[in-house]
Amino acid sequence: MTTPADDQGKSPENPWPVRAVATRVAKYIDRLGMVWIEGQLTELKIRQTTAWMVLRDPAADMSLSVSCPRDLVANAPVPLSEGTQVIVLGKPQFYTRNGSFSLRISEIRAVGIGELLARIDRLRRLLDAEGLFDPRLKRPIPFLPGTIGLITGRASHAERDVMTVAANRWPAVRFAVRNPIVQGPNAVPQIVGALRELDRDPGVDVIVLARGGGSVEDLLPFSDETLCREIASCTTPVVSAVGHEPDNPLCDLVADLRAATPTDAAKRVVPDAAAEQAFVTDLRRRSARALRQWVHREQHHLDQLRSRPVLARPLQAIDARADEVHRAVAAARRDVRRMVTVESERVGHLSARLTALGPAATLARGYAVVQTMPDTNVLRTTADAPAGTRLRIRVADGAITAVSEGTDEAH
């Protein structure tokens, strides 16, 4: 069975008063107890007895108000300033009067260089395992970009070096410059915002992320996980030119091209107009020389051919061959005529022999061939022609039809 108190706050007819909600939230937060929290210090303000600051998480762009005794900051093992990465021990508090949330800390520790490097190394291994450093994912840098997106500190040496060197190499080059903060707790969100803006611009062909050298803490934003993943997700090629040659922030490994310095980035992104012009001029000169040499060589070869005796009287060889052809044709004709005569005589002799041996010659001497009709069998005995048998009698000049009247006895 529910009571009116249990139903309070569950309907517009029975709402909670502000004090009740604030009290409940304060009690819940109070039960959290002491917690260790890590973040970057921003907006550090020291008053007479209390120090106020904001503890920020750059990866998530979230912050938390923090207060502590002034002596806690003054007696810290290392000097604390905005951008310092710290670990604090504090108790969350909720102030019911104004509904604000804060953290009252009793201990503060600056994260050392060794710990920062260890965390960067752990992140490096994580990103490498995910394939963000895979060379096969690197996008090619365009040979001649129309517009270069440049992300760098305002009026910095890096900005001056990139733009000056690029303009000297290719005067027509254009820049889309974004000037975020490049160190400190607010650097990462501003750099990420500039990167997204330039990546969305269809006119930008390549993006250069440039910053001069600095300490590990100064370059820490360029090893931030959020920034590294944003670079990996860009569709526009990204060139990392952060720090000097020994520096190696994680953005160098994710970017499509790593430049040793901002000056080196300008040289690798923008071709040298003078060098390209010299290269083209040299190609034209070498091509012309090669063409002249080829023409000279072929002309010399042609002169050699023209100087040959056969080309002085080019028809002489043809005439000689023509005479040979005529003689061969005449000889062939003689041979054919002789062969035809010989074969004709041979055919005549064979024909005469066939005539002498054939039945026509026998018939011409008075003989006849008698055949029974209608089967045309040659009559060989009288028994083959009984009375009434129709006969065909073939003689030298034709054939006679007769009918057998019977047989006579041989005498």
Swiss-Prot record:
Molecular function GO labels: exodeoxyribonuclease VII activity; nucleic acid binding
Listed CDD domains: ExoVII_LU_OBF
Compartment(s) where it occurs, according to its Swiss-Prot or TrEMBL record: Cytoplasm
InterPro entries: Exonuc_VII_L (IPR003753), Exonuc_VII_lsu_C (IPR020579), OB-fold_nuc-bd_dom (IPR025824)
Gene Ontology cellular-component annotations: cytoplasm; exodeoxyribonuclease VII complex
One GO biological process term: DNA catabolic process
Reactions that this protein is recorded to catalyse: Exonucleolytic cleavage in either 5'- to 3'- or 3'- to 5'-direction to yield nucleoside 5'-phosphates
Transmembrane annotation, as ranges: none
Enzyme class: hydrolase
Keyword presence, Cytoplasm: yes
EC number: 3.1.11.6
Sorted UniProt keywords: Cytoplasm, Exonuclease, Hydrolase, Nuclease
Protein family according to the UniProt entry: Belongs to the XseA family.
Classification via PANTHER family: EXODEOXYRIBONUCLEASE 7 LARGE SUBUNIT
Subunit structure: Heterooligomer composed of large and small subunits.
NCBIfam families hit by this protein: xseA
Biological function: Bidirectionally degrades single-stranded DNA into large acid-insoluble oligonucleotides, which are then degraded further into small acid-soluble oligonucleotides.
Protein's recorded name: Exodeoxyribonuclease 7 large subunit
Organism whose genome encodes this protein: Mycobacterium sp. (strain JLS)
Gene behind this protein: xseA
